[in-house]
Every structure is written in structure tokens, then in C-alpha cells.
């Protein structure tokens, strides 16, 4: 099976290249590629950054306005999707969600370090193959609280300038 290759261009930080795994999470990969093709991620930010854990983006603008996307089925073992055995190790891309296992839409996270407690609980669907230095730099930004409910928000926006599909 061919693994799609994508690039995530982050303003002032550089580029992360990732390989996606449709054999692990086919609908997740198809949804992510469709969002990239639609330009959905352009101008959105990494809005939650926890050094030693992960960076999360794909759902908020620089002004912290939420951008909605359609939800898809969560393709992970605890949700009955047994073929996804991807471990949440450094560099893995995975879908963020609420408590509802079928609430993943556009928000994703990139593992800064291994987090085995997420295995089988979230839909991992790819892995950074180049640009781990970019991941490290993003994970090191200063964060704080936004409003009364959002924690680990970067003090200065970490903007996804664009994402591109290198190959399908």
C-alpha cells in the first residue's frame, strides 16, 4: 500500500514532513487529505502545546475562533476498530477528540514524546519522517491560559501557513 506524504509548513518554525497510514485508519487519512486539499488548515494554529507530550492544532484561528469540520468515526481499538495498532510514539500524528469516540474532525496532535496511555484510545494515522527539530522547537514555546478554560495555549500564535500533499 502506498503511504501518502504530506508537509506541514509552520510560520517561523519550518516544515514537518509526515507519512500517513491508510491501512491503519483509512477514513481518518481520507478525511485529513480532503481537508488539506480544501485548504482547511491554512492560517490555523497549534493551540495546545505541552512539552514532553504533544502539540495540538487544526481547530482554531490566530484569534482563537473555533473552526468546525464534520466529525468522523474514531478509528481506534477502544472504539471497535481493531486494525489500528499504531503506538503513540514520538512524531506520531493522531486525531484529537472529545469524550465522544466519534467526535474527531480536523483537530490533530503530533506526539512530542511517547505516550503509551493513548494507545488504542485515539486514532493514530501517520508519523513525522522529517522535521523533528521543528516539532521540538514548537514544543518549547511559552504557553499560558486563554480565557477561563483553555490551558497550554502558546503566548505567541504558532501558525500553520499551509499543508500540502506531496504524494498520494
Locations of the language-model features?
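Cyclophilin-like peptidyl-prolyl cis-trans isomerases
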Residues: 1-168
Amino acid at each position: 500500500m502506498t503511504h501518502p506524504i504530506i508537509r506541514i509548513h509552520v510560520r517561523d518554525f519550518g516544515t514537518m514532513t509526515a507519512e500517513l497510514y491508510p491501512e491503519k485508519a483509512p477514513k481518518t487519512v481520507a478525511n485529513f487529505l480532503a481537508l488539506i486539499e480544501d485548504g482547511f488548515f491554512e492560517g490555523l494554529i497549534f493551540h495546545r502545546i505541552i512539552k514532553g507530550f504533544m502539540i495540538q492544532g487544526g481547530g482554531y484561528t490566530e484569534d482563537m475562533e473555533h473552526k468546525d469540520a464534520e466529525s468522523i468515526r474514531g478509528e481506534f481499538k477502544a472504539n471497535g476498530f481493531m486494525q489500528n495498532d499504531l503506538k503513540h510514539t514520538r512524531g506520531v500524528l493522531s486525531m484529537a477528540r472529545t469524550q465522544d469516540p466519534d467526535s474527531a474532525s480536523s483537530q490533530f496532535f503530533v506526539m512530542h514524546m511517547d505516550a503509551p496511555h493513548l494507545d488504542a484510545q485515539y486514532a493514530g494515522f501517520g508519523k513525522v519522517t522529517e522535521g523533528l527539530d521543528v516539532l521540538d522547537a514548537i514544543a518549547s514555546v511559552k504557553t499560558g491560559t486563554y480565557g477561563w478554560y483553555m490551558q497550554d495555549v502558546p503566548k505567541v500564535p504558532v501558525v500553520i501557513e499551509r499543508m500540502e500533499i506531496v504524494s498520494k
